[in-house]
Amino acid sequence: MISLVVARDRNGAIGRDGDIPWHIPEDLKFFQRETVGGAVIMGRRTWESLPDVARPLKNRLNLVVSSGRPEGAEHVLPSVEAALEVARDAGHARISGIGGAGIYRALLPLSHRLLITEVDLAVEDADTWFPSFDEAEWTVTTRFDLRAQGSRCELVEWMRKL
């Protein structure tokens, strides 16, 4: 199953100046629980935005899509299709696209599930957005609050209709 795991603001923003414009521990814990044991596909900038101590993401097959050779990345692939092939050849049934916007755009048509943390704020000067998708092709299967204090966060699971 291919899932996209993302946190976005109320306008769909996911980034500003190469970084995630919020810090929400509850969402980070959810991200870890969801992705551990599987394969994660990310772009070079997402790879480089990870703190050195978190790179590579532990207990996951880290696949970086890039035309270059990002420092410290063991598995660098030229396309999401090549990354999917490596993940499947390694026996991973759970594959998560974790950003950035180009990875989300490329994987969206192939994805079965969207795990979207809706962050109740609007990021000024955002420069990166999650792609829009046709909600008629998807069904909300789960919705729950990750965080009630501070910036409210709601996790919404969408499954592609068959």
Question: How should each PLM-predicted stretch be described?
Answer:
Residues M1-L162:
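Enzymes that bind and transform nitrogen-containing heteroaromatic metabolites
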